[in-house]
Amino acid sequence: MICRDCPSCAMGWVKNRPEEAWCIGVPEPFHIDDIDMTCTEYFDTPYEVASHTTIQFSPDGNYTPKFIMLVGIPGSGKSTKAKELSKQHIAGKSVVHISSDAIRGRIYGDESCQRDPGKVFSIMHEETINALNSGHTVIYDATNITRKSRKEILNKIPNFVSKECVVCWAPIEVCIERDKARVRTVGENVIDKMLRRFEAPYYDEGFNKITVSIDGLHYHRRQYYIDLLSAINISHDNPHHTADILEHCRLCGIKLIGEAPDFIVNAGFVHDIGKAYTKTFKNHKGEESDIAHYYDHQAVGAWLSYGIEGHSPTLAWLISTHMAPFINQKYYNSLPPLYKSWIDKLHKADREAH
């Protein structure tokens, strides 16, 4: 169904649940409670997930251990989530928490030491496989923000293991403030660099389940969405677009209505939400430019989108991947036909909405 606030906000956001049938612009909108999204988790089950995964029985025929990969930028709540999950005992076996920081501390005496990451992750991979083969569920704790970093370990996981991903999410400013409060801080610049490299995890990588965890965080989801839209209500300042960013997103979403499933329509309406954060009048060489550039906006937009609504693993992946036909054809060409068709629909609407 279309957002009932569409006449006022003109966005046309497609809603899948009645409690979300609002957007902005109505004095007294239909809304759920002022949301405190504390210890909240959600996940989606898109089409043909099973066709990309295989789960078998463990060697003893009784229990299938889990490989649970945490994904997130610094300050997003990975450590908190790891501690929570590590307290469990499954089928009489403890859950093993394997952390890249802990391994750095063990071999170098300093968890912040970035020396020889290859050695660190080689040890991490070996310990992970050994624990899984012993029947333990493993919490794999590192940033894991790129497909390459995830693939290196996913390709080694035994077939009998269930592969799960938990995206630990918080708004960017919250991650920065949490980092500042730590004794061992990475700094805002490092967080920014990681954010711009972020590639949303998805089922084509081999995951059986992807969960988004928003833990210990209080924020109002509707206001968060309004703020995202307000931020992109600015000029593109770029000859490739005649419409402002918000208007471009609106046109993209409208073009998809009736032409694509609702979740792709939704992605069209917000696919460029990362542009407000990334807008710069410097080119890729750092030189002053007369036009605006939006390097890595798809990465930032994907991260921002996790706070919008309850089926964001797919929404985030679509935003993260919508530029792939331009900037990452190798990945685009590797996608299953169904997933590629989703990107094609979004990419076509994006190009036509100027």
Regions found by a protein language model. Give the residues of each.
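Conserved substrate/cofactor phosphate-moiety recognition/catalytic segment
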Residues: A82-H136
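Cysteine-centered metal-binding/redox modules
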Residues: M1-S58
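Acidic/His-rich, divalent-metal-binding segments that scaffold phosphate/diphosphate chemistry
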Residues: S213-D290
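Conserved phosphate-donor/acceptor-positioning beta-strand/loop module used by diverse small-molecule
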Residues: V161-C175
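Conserved GTP-binding G-domain of TRAFAC-class P-loop NTPases and closely related GTPase folds
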Residues: F67, V71, E173-R222
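ATP-binding Walker
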Residues: S76
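Walker A/P-loop
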Residues: S79
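Divalent metal-dependent catalytic cores for phosphoryl transfer on phosphate-bearing substrates
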Residues: K255-H354
